[in-house]
């Protein structure tokens, strides 16, 4: 259900943008999916296509790009990637992080110094990286 809510927000944003730009058609929507949130791209794509049906976005190409999750320790400055520690997380913890990415601090620590005080440098959320539109001739 979380993916449907994300898809709805993406579609509403794309349609609002297209309307403000007086677009006649949305040709493509590029969406970046942060690795940390572990969003199911297939479900988001299906939901987006359903939500775009009957709008100027129907038939738009949907492009996904996964953004690797990178962390930086505030204590020692060490940087590491989620894939380096992901195998230590069980399915329940991954589900918790999926819904509330901020809880990652409770389950992951810096592999260098053990601190839980780190920042997510990239790969946390979901955002629209681009919307390609078509305008009527003369606009």
UniProtKB/Swiss-Prot annotation:
Signal peptide: none annotated. One of its GO terms (molecular function) is zinc ion binding. It holds the Pfam family HypA. Ni(2+) binds at residue 2. Gene3D superfamilies: 3.30.2320.80. GO terms for biological process: protein maturation; protein modification process. Zn(2+) binds at residues 73, 76, 110, 113. It comes from the Archaea. Keywords: Metal-binding, Nickel, Zinc. HAMAP family: HypA_HybF (MF_00213). Belongs to the HypA/HybF family. Involved in the maturation of [NiFe] hydrogenases. Required for nickel insertion into the metal center of the hydrogenase. This is Hydrogenase maturation factor HypA. It comes from Pyrococcus abyssi (strain GE5 / Orsay). The gene is hypA.
């Amino acid at each position: 259900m979380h993916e449907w809510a994300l898809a709805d927000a993406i579609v509403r944003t794309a349609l609002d943008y297209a309307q403000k730009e007086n677009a006649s058609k949305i040709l493509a929507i590029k969406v970046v999916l942060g690795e940390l949130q572990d969003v199911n791209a297939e479900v988001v794509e299906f939901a987006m296509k359903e939500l775009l049906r009957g709008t100027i976005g129907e038939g738009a190409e949907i492009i996904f790009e996964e953004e690797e999750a990178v962390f930086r320790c505030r204590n020692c400055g060490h940087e590491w990637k989620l894939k380096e520690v992901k195998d230590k997380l069980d399915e329940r913890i991954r589900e918790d992080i999926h819904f509330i990415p901020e809880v990652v601090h409770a389950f992951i620590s810096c592999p260098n110094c053990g601190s839980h005080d780190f920042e997510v440098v990239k790969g946390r959320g979901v955002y629209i990286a681009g919307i390609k539109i078509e305008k009527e001739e003369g606009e």
